[in-house]
Amino acid sequence: DQPGDVKTHKQYDVNYLFFKI
């Protein structure tokens, strides 16, 4: 896993959470 991938994953998680709400 690359640092960039981790950042993207974190942002994706946030977007997913926001969308779920």
Curated annotation (Swiss-Prot):
The lineage of its organism: Eukaryota, Metazoa, Ecdysozoa, Arthropoda, Crustacea. Hemocyanins are copper-containing oxygen carriers occurring freely dissolved in the hemolymph of many mollusks and arthropods. It comes from Maja squinado. Belongs to the tyrosinase family. Hemocyanin subfamily. Its main location: secreted. It comes from the Eukaryota. It is found in: Secreted, Extracellular space. Keywords: Copper, Oxygen transport, Secreted, Transport. The keyword Membrane does not apply. Hemolymph. This is Hemocyanin subunit 1. The keyword Transmembrane does not apply. One of its GO terms (molecular function) is oxygen carrier activity. One of its GO terms (cellular component) is extracellular region.
